[in-house]
Amino acid sequence: MSESPYKSGTTHFGFRDVAAKDKQKLVGQVFTSVARNYDLMNDLMSMGVHRAWKRYYVATAQVKPGDRVLDLAGGTGDIAALLKERVGVEGSVVLGDINAGMLSVGRDRLTNRGLVLGLDYVQCNAEALPFPDNSFDLVTIAFGLRNVTDKDAGLREMYRVLKVGGQARVLEFSEVTADWFKPIYDFHSFKILPKLGKLFANDSDSYQYLAESIRKHPPQEELKAMMGQAGFERCHYKNLTGGIVSIHSGYKL
């Protein structure tokens, strides 16, 4: 297990080294800036494919009617909405996010869609979740783990709040596996994406950070090992779209 960033004193914020205690605030500023344009941001970052990734991510989760699910870094609520369809009226979904602006957007959007019952919204830090042990049948985090300062702590908390037999699933931008595609992907990420952010959201800096944060995120095998170190068993991952994203899964047994 790697040393906590809080003990070493520094961590990365994109390609910059910053004090570990400052990263949460810096990431918060990014997501406060992009909250109202979050879906646009995902469209630009994924070239529009993120919607299909998310549908597959939820469709392949072992979630059933009556389950209680925690969706961390739930953002604008698109994953929570898909999960609520699957748990039905007997089940419940808690949408957790550290950023109040993102949480507000998610609540408004789901309420406007008529999704009210069985949905709760909690502002929380993934590194110190305000839930008892063994609370959820499924814990998800989509495009959020790379922004957590202490990822090991976040994974341990996901494990703690899962019920025995429960599953954790991580959907995240990952390491591209096709060598021929890497230069194309890098060009899009570092040359095109910030310009699109400036053009459509008047915010190139946030999009530059988000591209850099993907490159600093642990690659597939490393994240799989981290999940095992956090206590998860039967850990595995599946690459989507040539490794642009991957889905990692682990169980509390």
Swiss-Prot record:
Keywords: Menaquinone biosynthesis, Methyltransferase, S-adenosyl-L-methionine, Transferase, Ubiquinone biosynthesis
Protein name: Ubiquinone/menaquinone biosynthesis C-methyltransferase UbiE
Gene Ontology molecular function: 2-methoxy-6-polyprenyl-1,4-benzoquinol methyltransferase activity; demethylmenaquinone methyltransferase activity
Catalysed reaction equations from the record: a 2-demethylmenaquinol + S-adenosyl-L-methionine = a menaquinol + S-adenosyl-L-homocysteine + H(+); a 2-methoxy-6-(all-trans-polyprenyl)benzene-1,4-diol + S-adenosyl-L-methionine = a 5-methoxy-2-methyl-3-(all-trans-polyprenyl)benzene-1,4-diol + S-adenosyl-L-homocysteine + H(+)
Originating organism: Stenotrophomonas maltophilia (strain R551-3)
Cross-referenced PROSITE patterns: SAM_MT_UBIE, UBIE_1, UBIE_2
Any GO BP annotation: menaquinone biosynthetic process
Lineage: Bacteria, Pseudomonadati, Pseudomonadota, Gammaproteobacteria, Lysobacterales
Residue stretches spanning the membrane: none
